[in-house]
């Protein structure tokens, strides 16, 4: 029942639908009380042989009319109740998706993709089922059960009612004990399902590697092992589940046996009529649903509770919380200042960055270089707030970037990574991904800056040429230039190029770098991280990072003078290699 309390906010939000549904359920419960009474009257009339005088046909028509009304009302409550619960599914998934979009890399290191998919699909379904079927069974079982018992006591015999319901408290105690077992079993089964889902997702993503190394059988066996584990967990649930209905039917049968035995005895002493006993047995039959529903409700609620706890453990109770107030970011390009005292990843003891201090003004180009694994990519992630800095400060306009809304902060930046991603769409649509309503003139201006326009005009359909699986195959350099054009189109205040020119030739690289000089005249800041030091010649400031620390800082002309240090030595080596 704790789950229903935790979903109170949603029941209040959808109170109209739930109120109408509950009202209809109450109406149905009341209407269902009449047919057994009327059938008992018909039986007594038949036994007394008063069929000619008694209104048998009207009684039959009343029973038929009530049945039709009940059918219509059942249809209507389904629309209101399940309509409301399905809205919960949409709301939960949107909120969870938005929450996931705002998380940083640390979050995705803790939670695997398959597990997240399982929680946003399978677990949400279980919670929604509890908000729909769970509420139905709770309300219907209580109202129907109480109503029938009241009628049995007041209209037929209180003695017969008490004797017939003796097995019910025992059944309730047993159901409660099963509920606790079900909760832990469902939680374990959902966790195992998440592992299975995640394993399948990882294997499908890397199927080309599995095939390349001939590891199909090996990974199939591992998958089978996890599938068997999932099967065992579900069988455990099925075993507990399978005891529910037999126990309920056993106690219902005992109730019927007591009713018929004691009722027959009461007929002989004229305490009740045969028709009343038949009505009583029919009423007892109406209690079967509340009993089954009550047990089923525990089943549904425990499933939903286990799933809700899994969702909460993922979001750390941060869903639907009041959003923090952030400072506004000026639309005027500002100074970006980085002061990193110390940084390491949460699951590692290794220091990634330390004593990183630099400042870059609007319109300047910052070059970042250094050996592989020195911390360059981590620095870029910290600036983008993909990961959070705990010891130090990164400021823009002299305001720490943590005080800005993360979405608004990222809108200030355009990022081009070494690994490019293109949709199966036209070249134009791929370029205007971040600015869907960009004009053709704006697109062509961006491709001119990225030295791609002439290449595109050689394609059969120009900017409308399809790329991807069903289109033409582009070279690595062309893909990178589409990504650069996509970023330049946004005209963001900060442009981050992370090895973005690694696949282009020297001539194209020179053209792009010259074009960027023109592009940044609007005071755009460029941060360029690269292994190719020739790309940094025109940088206003270059920092060399080795083992997480800045070992050299200055302009290109200054840094190449010292051939004993990394920058001068590497630049000379690359220059000789090119020749």
Curated annotation (Swiss-Prot):
The chain crosses the membrane at residues 20-40, 53-73, 134-154, 155-175, 247-267, 281-301. Keywords: ATP-binding, Cell membrane, Membrane, Nucleotide-binding, Translocase, Transmembrane, Transmembrane helix, Transport. Belongs to the ABC transporter superfamily. Drug exporter-2 (TC 3.A.1.117) family. ATP binds at residues 370-377. CDD domains: ABC_6TM_TmrB_like. One of its GO terms (molecular function) is ABC-type oligopeptide transporter activity. GO terms for cellular component: plasma membrane. It holds the Pfam family ABC_tran. Its main location: membrane. It is a multi-pass membrane protein. It comes from the Bacteria. It is an enzyme of class 7 (translocase). It is found in: Cell membrane. InterPro entries: AAA+_ATPase, ABC1_TM_dom, ABC1_TM_sf, ABC_transporter-like_ATP-bd, ABC_transporter-like_CS, P-loop_NTPase, Type_1_exporter. It comes from Buchnera aphidicola subsp. Baizongia pistaciae (strain Bp). It catalyses: ATP + H2O + xenobioticSide 1 = ADP + phosphate + xenobioticSide 2. The lineage of its organism: Bacteria, Pseudomonadati, Pseudomonadota, Gammaproteobacteria, Enterobacterales. Its EC number is 7.6.2.2. Residues 338-572 form the ABC transporter domain. Residues 18-303 form the ABC transmembrane type-1 domain. This is Multidrug resistance-like ATP-binding protein MdlA.
């Amino acid at each position: 029942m704790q789950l229903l309390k935790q979903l109170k906010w949603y029941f209040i939000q959808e109170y109209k639908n739930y109120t109408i549904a509950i009202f209809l359920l109450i109406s149905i419960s009341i209407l269902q009380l009449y047919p057994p009474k009327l059938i008992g009257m018909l039986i007594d009339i038949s036994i007394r042989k008063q069929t000619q005088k008694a209104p048998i046909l009207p009684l039959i028509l009343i029973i038929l009319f009530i049945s039709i009304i009940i059918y219509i009302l059942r249809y209507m409550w389904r629309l209101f109740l399940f309509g409301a619960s399905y809205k919960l599914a949409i709301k939960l998934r949107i909120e969870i998706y938005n929450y996931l979009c705002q998380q940083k890399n640390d979050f995705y290191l803790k939670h695997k993709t398959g597990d997240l998919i399982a929680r946003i699909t399978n677990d949400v379904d279980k919670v929604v089922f509890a908000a729909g079927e769970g509420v139905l069974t709770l309300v219907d079982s209580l109202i129907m059960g109480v109503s029938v018992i009241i009628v049995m006591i007041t209209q037929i015999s209180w003695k017969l009612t008490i004797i017939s319901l003796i097995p019910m408290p025992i059944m309730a105690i047993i159901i409660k004990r099963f509920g606790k077992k079900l909760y832990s079993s469902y939680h374990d089964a959902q966790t195992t399902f998440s592992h299975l889902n995640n394993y399948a997702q990882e294997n499908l993503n890397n199927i080309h590697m599995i095939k390349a190394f001939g590891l199909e059988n090996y990974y199939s066996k591992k998958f089978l092992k996890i599938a068997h584990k999932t099967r065992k967990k579900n069988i455990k649930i099925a075993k507990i589940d399978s005891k529910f209905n037999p126990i309920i039917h056993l106690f219902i049968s005992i109730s019927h046996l007591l009713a018929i035995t004691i009722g027959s005895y009461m007929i002989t002493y004229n305490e009740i009529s045969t028709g009343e006993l038949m009505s009583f047995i029919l009423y007892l039959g109406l209690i079967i649903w509340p009993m089954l529903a009550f047990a089923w409700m525990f089943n549904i609620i425990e499933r939903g509770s286990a799933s809700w706890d899994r969702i909460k453990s993922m979001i750390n109770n941060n869903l639907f919380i009041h959003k923090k107030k952030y400072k506004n970011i000026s639309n005027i390009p500002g100074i970006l200042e980085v002061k990193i005292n110390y940084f390491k990843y949460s699951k590692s003891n290794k220091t990634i960055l330390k004593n990183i201090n630099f400042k870059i003004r609007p319109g300047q180009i910052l070059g970042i270089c250094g050996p592989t694994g020195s911390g360059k990519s981590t620095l870029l992630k910290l600036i983008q707030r993909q990961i959070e800095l705990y010891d130090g400060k990164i400021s823009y306009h002299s305001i720490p970037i943590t005080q800005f809304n993360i979405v608004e902060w990222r809108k200030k930046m355009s990022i081009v990574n070494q690994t490019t991603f293109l949709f199966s769409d036209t070249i134009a649509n791929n370029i205007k991904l971040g600015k869907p309503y960009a004009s053709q003139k704006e697109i062509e201006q961006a491709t001119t800056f990225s030295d791609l326009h002439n290449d595109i005009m050689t394609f059969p359909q120009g900017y409308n040429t399809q790329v991807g699986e069903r289109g033409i195959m582009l070279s690595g350099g062309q893909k990178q230039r589409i990504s650069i054009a996509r970023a330049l189109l946004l005209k963001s205040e900060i442009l981050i190029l992370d090895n973005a020119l690694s696949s282009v030739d020297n001539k194209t690289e020179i053209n792009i770098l010259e074009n960027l000089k023109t592009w940044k005249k609007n005071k755009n800041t460029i941060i360029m991280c690269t292994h190719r030091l020739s790309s940094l010649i025109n940088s206003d400031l270059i920092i060399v990072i080795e083992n997480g620390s800045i070992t050299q800082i200055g302009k290109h002309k200054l840094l190449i003078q010292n051939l004993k240090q990394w920058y001068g030595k590497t630049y000379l080596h690359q220059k000789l290699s090119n020749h």
